[in-house]
Structure formats: structure tokens, C-alpha cells
Swiss-Prot record:
Bifunctional serine/threonine kinase and phosphorylase involved in the regulation of the pyruvate, phosphate dikinase (PPDK) by catalyzing its phosphorylation/dephosphorylation. ADP binds at G150, L151, P152, R153, T154, S155, K156, T157. GO terms for molecular function: ADP binding; ATP binding; phosphotransferase activity, phosphate group as acceptor; protein serine/threonine kinase activity. It comes from the Bacteria. Keywords: Kinase, Nucleotide-binding, Serine/threonine-protein kinase, Transferase. Belongs to the pyruvate, phosphate/water dikinase regulatory protein family. PDRP subfamily. This is Putative pyruvate, phosphate dikinase regulatory protein 1.
Amino acid sequence: MADNKLHIFAVSDSVGETAEKIAVASVLQFNLDRNITRFSRVTKEEQVEKIIDQAVENDAIIIYTIVKPELSRFLDETARIKQVIAVNVMAPLFDAIQFKTGQKPEYITGLTHKMDDQYFNRMKAIEYTIEHDNGQNLDSVHEADLIVLGLPRTSKTPLSMHLANLGIKVANYPILMDTEIPQEIVDLKGRIPMVGLTIDIDTLMELRKERFRSFELPDDIETLDDLVAEELDNAYRIYAKLKCLVIDVTLDDIEEVGNTITHKFNLPLRITHHRF
């Protein structure tokens, strides 16, 4: 260390955040002046040669997360010839996982950065969906990927949050008797996919009876039966007007309903799971 400073080059064929974070975490354990330089998108042998030459000039350690085996070997061999310390931080774990599972890594670059993007997309979708639950913030309802309408107790919110966890921005709105659907939603007919949730009349009757009892109200069966039938008729009228995809949620769980919706509308799933 000619300048009394430890130089570390964090080299990656992707963004390089992983290599840099490992370098930072490591040098913090030493009381040293240090300089960490990140080299991103290193995909060619010519780039590797230039970086190693710089490492020679600066007496630097290279730590790298190059996924492609050929380029990784080239870096390792070139560094050894030029007497530069180079540490492949992913290789030991690759070997351990391969030994344990019998599977070979797929050597796809950029997966960590892709996962970061997916996390950001999911957080944005969840934030949007929470802010647009139960008819809130209609001024930005046009930014939704999907609008879910439904009677109370038809799992609008759980369904919306399930879809948000897939990166889908959902606005949901309750269907209530004697309440007009806001013009902000009506204007989006045909522009944004809409789903209308319904439920078996007997199940809805039981839910309403429970609600009446919780408020210590008399649950007159005849009156309640008429009210529930009217509720459902009103919901179906609204769904027809808005050209909603109508889904009965009586028996299906949230995941099944979510799958039906995403496949029907080919919604932009921003969260994927990569198999190693």
C-alpha cells in the first residue's frame, strides 16, 4: 500500500452492489484508510484486463461477482499471472449449493438487481393499494392496474392486497345501497379492467345476520331476505353497467380468485420467481 490506503475494486458483470457491499462490510472490521471502487457491467475480457492493470498500479485487491464461468476464470487466471489478489465471493456458495442440491447454477447475470426492482415495484403497488382501499383517493384511481368492486364482506381488501403483493396496483370500491358509483370510476369503463365480486345469497344472509346481531338489532328474516336480494340485484346492475368481470367468491379462496383475474386480464405481474 504505497499511499497507506487499502484499495479494493468491486467488480461485477451486473450492477456491482453485492460486491461493493461485501467489500464495505469486510473493511469495516479493520482500522484502515480505504478506497472502494465499483466496476459495473464488466462482460468482456478487455474490460477485465484494464481493471487488473489498474489494480496493479494501485496495489488493489479485487473482489468480484462475475457469474459467467468463462469470464470468471479469465479474471482469476489473469490476476494470478499479474500477482493481484482476486476473490470470487460467489464461487464457494455456488459450490456448496450445487453439492447440497445436485443442481447446477444457471449463471444468469443481474438477478439481484432484478429482485431489487421487483421489491420496489411490489412496495409501490402495496402503497397504492392501501391508499385506494374502500373508495379512497378517487382523484388518482385512473393510475390503477385493476379496479375491484364488491359488496361489503366479499373480501375486496384481502384480494386487493394479494394482488398488490404481485406488483399490481389495485383500487377497490364498496357497492352500497342507494350509493351512486363515482364518475371517476364510470369514466374508466373499458380503459381499466374492472372486477365485480359477488357471493351466494345464503352466505350473504348469514353475514348480514351476524352484523345485525353485533349491533343488537332485530334480524327479521323476511325483511333481511328482501334487503339482501335487493343488495345483490343492485350490485349486478352496476357490474353490467361497468362491464365488470363478475366473480363469485363464495367457495374460492383469495389465491384462486387472484389467479382467475390475472389470467383473464393478462395483468402486468411485476413479481416473478426464478427457479435456480
